[in-house]
Amino acid sequence: KLNKDNKYKTVFRKKSRSLASAFVRGITETSGDYIGWLDTNQSELAPKFNIMIKELETDSDIVIMSRYVSGGGDDRLLLRSLSSKYFNLFARLILRIPIKDLTNSIFLMKRKVLDEVTFLGYGHGEFFFEFLYNAYKKGYKIKEIPHLQKRDQNAQDSKSAPNLIRFFYYGVLYVLRIFSTILRRRN
């Protein structure tokens, strides 16, 4: 049950499937002090937003549910969980930031972050690590709290799981986005 003191707004989209476009729509339609999201296949995590709000009320600007901090984990198929873990390690090393889970995108943040941090609203999940990178470089405090990623109920739960070609396609897009993020930051 959600905390009655906090108000939540849910936006349902039926046509566009782009994660980045969902983010753009969400932030244009929201008016609260905190902005966050999670995919509908993870809606059981909504009550954890109350924990995230408490973190924001203390000393954090962005709170991420992370698979790669103590207490978190990844229960998906071995190929998916290992590739995600090693991609996050690779991204963290290349981007030189301490965030351990750059691709989970279950988060809550203070609205003020959007006043300074811009992002390019295209792509699948790769726009999120660019957003986190830019927020970190501007000095915003990012806190990760543990999250156990459950096994996908079916292949349609993931954009990358249905076949290996698609899996590697998204992997290449993510790697390209890492390097373009660095180049944009230098300009």
Where are these regions (language model features)?
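Acidic donor-binding segment of Leloir-type glycosyltransferases
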Residues: K1-V11
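Anion (oxyanion) recognition and catalysis
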Residues: K4, E57, Y136
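Short loop/turn motifs at secondary-structure junctions
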Residues: K7, S31, D59, G139-K141
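Acceptor/aglycone-binding surface of glycosyltransferases and processive sugar-polymer synthases
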Residues: R13-E29, Y34, P47-G125, R151-V172
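A short, conserved beta-strand element in the Rossmann-like catalytic core
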Residues: N41-S43
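Catalytic donor-sugar/metal-binding loop of nucleotide-sugar-dependent glycosyltransferases
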Residues: I97-P98, G123, L132-K150
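C-terminal catalytic/acceptor-binding lobe
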Residues: G139-N187
